[in-house]
Amino acid sequence: MIDKYGRSIDYLRVSITDRCNLRCIYCMPPQGVTFKTHSSILRYEEIIKIVEVGTELGIKKVRITGGEPLVRQGVVNLIKELRKIPELEDITMTTNGVLLPKYAFALKRAGLSRVNISLDSLNPDTYKTITRRGEFSQAIEGIKAALEVGLNPVKINTVVMKGINDNELENFVNLTIDKDLHVRFIEYMPMGETSLLSGNYYVSLNEFKEIIIDKMGMVPVNIQNNGPSKDFKVPGAKGTVGFITAISHNFCSTCNRMRLTADGFLRPCLASDVEVNMRDEDGKISSEGVREKFEKALLLKPISHNFYKNDFFPKKNMSQIGG
């Protein structure tokens, strides 16, 4: 699929649930959110149909997200069924890692290519502050499980927040020296009710990037198909370090993705409230209708995101859209 700005759209992020076993401060407001009812969430067979039509239109890569995708029953079988779609080249997942010790082997066997694990602190107390309920040791065991079964490359997603974890970047870089881990520092993005805290949390990664690169002696590396990340590594290290600067230096000109929410809405841009209902008027998912909705969303994809423009923030929280 080619949008009106000449960008090739071949990547679909699929949220399968808005529920999560953590309550991260940048993903959900303190009071929590009202979760979608079971009947409003797309059934797995509906997700498969949407992906099948998407691949006919040019989708080659799917990332399974949440909420936390591993809290939804049957996710391993979903991966297995998606792997049967011949045009689908890559199936990945973003997870907080807590349940990976239980599911990593089965996910790998089902056909999952690799995982991104959200880990925002290497300090157990700070980790609990950020997640509001998580145990740091469980996340670490999840990373170990992913490495052991070969869900490679294992990427660590770290949202950098001012005054919370911005003093830990060097420690994260050190993770990549002896382990085949690929840390990606991500700028905080204001979403939904959590956007009220954006003035407290947001910090441009440009303030840290050059300092860390110089201090750690990192050199640039070119990793194919690594999305918006600008990548570096410490010479001799097993892993790499990436910087994703969605706010300070956006990558909209090369954006290749759309997002499918757990309740069946296709969003052409994360930082926009524009979305297309993939269900027909009768509430069903049809191949013809899905094709039309993809084409409609393609036309609605903006030239760039709207973060901070005229004080705009997306109305939905990240957990409701899909992380």
Curated annotation (Swiss-Prot):
GO molecular function: 4 iron, 4 sulfur cluster binding; cyclic pyranopterin monophosphate synthase activity; GTP 3',8'-cyclase activity; GTP binding; metal ion binding; S-adenosyl-L-methionine binding
Superkingdom, taxonomy of origin: Bacteria
Keyword Transit peptide (UniProt): no
Cofactor: [4Fe-4S] cluster
SUPFAM superfamilies found in the cross-reference section: Radical SAM enzymes (SSF102114)
A GO BP annotation: Mo-molybdopterin cofactor biosynthetic process
Binding site for [4Fe-4S] cluster 1: C20, C24, C27
InterPro entries, alphabetized: Aldolase_TIM, Elp3/MiaA/NifB-like_rSAM, MoaA, MoaA_NifB_PqqE_Fe-S-bd_CS, MoaA_twitch, MoCo_biosynth_MoaA/MoaC, rSAM
Catalytic activity: GTP + AH2 + S-adenosyl-L-methionine = (8S)-3',8-cyclo-7,8-dihydroguanosine 5'-triphosphate + 5'-deoxyadenosine + L-methionine + A + H(+)
Span of domain Radical SAM core: 4-228
Family affiliation: Belongs to the radical SAM superfamily. MoaA family.
Functional summary from the UniProt entry: Catalyzes the cyclization of GTP to (8S)-3',8-cyclo-7,8-dihydroguanosine 5'-triphosphate.
Assembly, per entry: Monomer and homodimer.
Protein name, as recorded: GTP 3',8-cyclase
